Amino acid sequence: MVAAPCARRLARRSHSALLAALMVLLLHTLVVWNFSSLDSGAGEQRRAGAAAGAAEQQQPAAPRRERRDLAAHLPAARGGPGGRAGGGGARGGGPGGARAQQPASRGALASRARDPQPSPLITLETQDGYFSHRPKEKVRTDSNNENSVPKDFENVDNSNFAPRTQKQKHQPELAKKPPSRQKEHLQRKLDALDKRQGQSVLGKGPKEVLPPREKATGNSSQGKDLSRHSHARKSGGGGSPETKSDQAPKCDISGKEAISALTRAKSKHCRQEIAETYCRHKLGLLMPEKVARFCPLKGKAHKNVQWDEDAVEYMPANPVRIAFVLVVHGRAFRQFQRMSKAIYHKDHFYYIHVDKRSNYLHRQGLQFSRQYENVRVTSWKMATIWGGASFLSTYLQSMRDLLEMTDWPWDFFINLSAADYPIRTNDQLVAFLSRYRDMNFLKSHGRDNARFIRKQGLDRLFLECDTHMWRLGDRRIPEGIAVDGGSDWFLLNRKFVEYVAFSTDDLVTKMKQFYSYTLLPAESFFHTVLENSPHCDTMVDNNLRITNWNRKLGCKCQYKHIVDWCGCSPNDFKPQDFHRFQQTARPTFFARKFEAIVNQEIIGQLDSYLSGNFPAGTPGLRSYWEKLYDQSAPLRSLSDVALTMYHSFIRLGLRRAESSLHTDGENSCRYYPMGHPVSVHFYFLADRFQGFLIKHHVTNLAVSKLETLETWMMPKEVFKVASPPSDFGRLQFSEVGTDWDAKERLFRNFGGLLGPMDEPVGMQKWGKGPNVTVTVIWVDPVNVITATYDILIESTAEFTHYKPPLNLPLRPGVWTVKILHHWVPVAETKFLVAPLTFSNKQPIKPEEALKLHNGPPRSAYMEQSFQSLNPVLSLHINPAQVEQARKNAAFTGTALEAWLDSLVGGTWTAMDICTTGPTACPVMQTCSQTAWSSFSPDPKSELGAVKPDGRLR
């Protein structure tokens, strides 16, 4: 009888233990499922590998190292016992045993810091950190499969769940999380959102409510109705007025993509639009399910046209007239003007849309339009982001405008950008289009349609707001039609444009609705409508363009900060590509892309090929100027670093004028600077950066009158090969900067203006040769070694780049980056981190200066110290130098300016100075008479009177 209660207690305990075990197992399964679904993203994140280059920097491979003291390896590194010459494996700290690769991060550095024998080095792989095992794609010069997404789409991460790159800004604990911890952090955010659904899903408190909207504000500055279905309400410019509160969503927002978009959207207006769009789609109120097809053909029309050199030499009796729609942005007005000059003819029409964020270019465009009756600028503006729905809205509104201009009797619609250029003459283009005046020219993808839909994201729902394309979930392609797509550059005849712009039939109406929520809509909308419309038999699979696709360089997912997708961009043409314009296999009349700031020589070659050479002695043919800033723009458009450097440039230029132009006993050539810069230009000569041109006001001390001068500042050479030179010959050049463009392989921050809060990138250019490993060492102005890592250089590598994860702020002064092979110096380069004289565009305050100019706390640029390498590299830290740096950090006012100018003067040269108007200095040259000034003659880009043949060039 005693055993019975014991047995019952034992059974109850066993039952409880079993339940507890089941609960633990269930929780474990749930956690694993959550992580697997998070990792899958859209089902493809894990397969992204190193190709998912959403960030601009390549990720290093930093294996853990178990090595003895560095000094013990130096004899082997220099060729002694145990060393290995060259190097095919990734190494760290000189030669050692080959090690297994694992992805590196700041967390990897932290793990090595906890190692009993920590390595002071990390290891990188070469250019872009990704080598595909697929067969190399054969480059076809006549290929024109133009799509803005990678061909190897299945291997690319299109997830929008990955944490976004953050500047460190004194938050090393966040930046140093290993990838798994970052995923945990993101998962916690998404789980928290799930728990708060219904009260704070928009990222705000439960008491904040947004009033419901039936219609959102338009993107057009003039408030034009772009179409009932083109959804001009997208806030592409990012300037939409924020409402005072958020409204609780009208449905249960459960999709991870929508939740991710809500956590990242910045404005309340955008968050409400995301929630509203998601709910309408979830309730089946957004997307059409079935669309009518009106094409009488059963299959796809395959019309091809041939290039006949003889047929286009004769102008037809009734030549077509063309409406060029020029969609432009940025600040490269001289290049835009040169392109416009090349395509201009008095019989055609030019309608210019300038991005609403490009105010300078818009002002210049208005000035351009006032000179010619057949040039007009849209009265409305949109923010045409890459891949955005706003591009389609821009084209549709432009079409409606052109059709309503009864004084412009055009026959063809051609869209161009400032990066395009003609490769055949206007007469040839007109003769060709006159022969095929009933055709529409679009380039199709030419591959498997299901794969195109998948890689183009047509089966995904996107929304544009806050100048970003947010991915919100999946959707179905409407039934009843064939979906097509390819290039978003096309030539359309007037009849089809009228149909697209004004038709209210089921096809056009529903396609406008569908493509209002589509990524890269202009790459598919016109193709799909044409192929399913009564005009389907007019489609020619050729958009008459050559596009410079180099997907190995152009598909770096460089637009992930703009779209939740992985996109591609064409490369700029270079002189070695000129032969491609002379091909006669198929009719082509335009090419892209061209950037004068990258390479102007190819534009000059093409210009001479089409229109003949300029007269001998024509000035400015090899020069290029691009305005970076002018005083009509708000001062806040300049960074504190740029404003600081421009003021220093002005002071150094005036000192040069005083030393070279001033005569003892006279003050006629002595000046005092007045105010902020008036304008700033980049200056290039023969495609080499020559520096900045700063236009500024001064007071002449002799007559106390205001004058306007322009100063030319050129950077000094800072790359230096070791002396005596080593026998290592692969390194050609090294540079440090920011805004690395992996596609064109250059720094977009020309001049490398850096401040204490910038994150510099080190770049090396290599010649061909055997696989080798080199060591890169970063040294701050007081000889503190801030970072060191190895790079494995493959035999075919041309460029490597890496951004070391340094703690901020950087100590102001001249930094050095040393490159060693087998611990023998090969070369070094220097760069300036400028102390700031401005903070938030105001003179810097003492407490701000101390915070920014003293380096990171305890000079700890990383968790790990590299101090043991100082004696090995003969880099001695001088206490007096450290103390002087500490004193410099407290400088403000004139003392700070003097320190800054001494640093700038060591890395920049004041080349020349000139006056833009009257001056009291008798020996001061006039800017328009120099060869370098932005006021110098530039005939190649200047417009003029229309010539008797109707052209400008």
Curated annotation (Swiss-Prot):
Q: Which InterPro entries match?
A: Glyco_trans_14, XYLT, XylT_C
Q: What is the effect of changing W932R?
A: In pug; strongly reduced enzyme activity leads to defects in proteoglycan synthesis, abnormal chondrocyte maturation, premature ossification and dwarfism with short limbs and a compressed ribcage, which may be the cause for the increased mortality before weaning
According to its UniProt entry, this protein's organism is Mus musculus
Kindly tell me the pathway this chain contributes to. Answer: Glycan metabolism; chondroitin sulfate biosynthesis; Glycan metabolism; heparan sulfate biosynthesis
Region of interest (Disordered), residue spans: 48-67, 74-251, 933-953
What does the UniProt entry say about where the protein is found? Answer: Golgi apparatus membrane
What name has this protein been given in UniProt? Xylosyltransferase 1
Q: Which residues lie on this side of the membrane: Lumenal?
A: 39-953
Residues where UDP-alpha-D-xylose binds: V327, D355, T384, I385, W386, D488, W489, S569, R592, K593
Where, in residue ranges, is this chain on the Cytoplasmic side? Answer: 1-17
One of the record's GO cellular component terms? Golgi membrane
Statement: the UniProt record of this protein carries the keyword Transmembrane helix = yes
Enumerate composition-biased segments (Polar residues). 156-165
Q: How does it assemble?
A: Monomer.
**Known cofactor(s):** a divalent metal cation
Q: EC number(s) on record?
A: 2.4.2.26
Q: What class of enzyme is it?
A: transferase
Family statement drawn from the similarity comment of this UniProt entry: Belongs to the glycosyltransferase 14 family. XylT subfamily.
Any one of the GO BP annotations: embryonic skeletal system development
The record's GO molecular-function terms, alphabetically, read: metal ion binding; protein xylosyltransferase activity
Regions of compositional bias (Basic and acidic residues) in chain numbering: 138-154, 170-197, 205-216
